[in-house]
Amino acid sequence: MLIATIAGSLILVVVVVVVVIAVTNDNGTKPAAAGSSSASASPSASAFVSSKTTGPCGYTSADLAQNPNLKNTGFPPDPKPTPTKTVVADFLTNRGTIEVAFDGKAAPCNVQSIAYLIGKKFYNNTPCPRAVDSGIYVVQCGDPSGTGAGGPSYTVKDENLAAAKYTAGAVAMANGGPDTNGSQFFFITKDSSKGLQKNYTVIGHVTKGLDILEKVVNDGNDGSNQAGGGKPKLPLSFTTVKIASVVGGGPTPGSGPSPTVVTPSPTATPTPTPTAS
């Protein structure tokens, strides 16, 4: 998902001398407003409009029948107001520990979802299938299937895009178009502001272990993705992911009353899109 929705396909679009790299997650969910059945198409920057929410978040159900890479995770609790706490999580990997502070004030709905998935051990024993070292500098993770097309059984809306900054250490959601965030996200190891449009919700920052991610990017990749980047030559996998602490007021993200679930209309039913890997 660098990054995408989910995740996983990086789309390189070249127009004259303008290069746009999209981080996608190809989880098979596509909003009706996009007007296209292809989740791998590079999204229009003008289509991405978002702001912070006070809740409820209103999750959109994904079609598991059309995408076997999705997991039936149920839906996160969806209280009102949505928690705005900072969730600090430890990603124990085969190369050391990466610590991330997820910013519940900047992206409450997406952080609530991440906390929920961590609680369900969704990210345990999960590979990071893609790294990119040209144009943008990222490691894409969060897909248990390792295909770049996986994710949970729901999607989350974009948040606070206008304030997004894709600097070193930032963590952002991968997506397949507006409001299609799932479980995939990407770590940015070097300022990638020039290579990324403000289409990706920033959910937090790396507070420990950025050197691990830098090494993965710097060691290169196999170039297996036709759109750019590929499988890291230095493999990175999450072994265990756990919440280390929660800071701030309000309820704890990932806990609360039953969620509000939105089921896409028949006209918005997605068409599976194969990912380039």
What does each model-found stretch correspond to?
Residues M1-S277:
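Cyclophilin-like peptidyl-prolyl cis-trans isomerases
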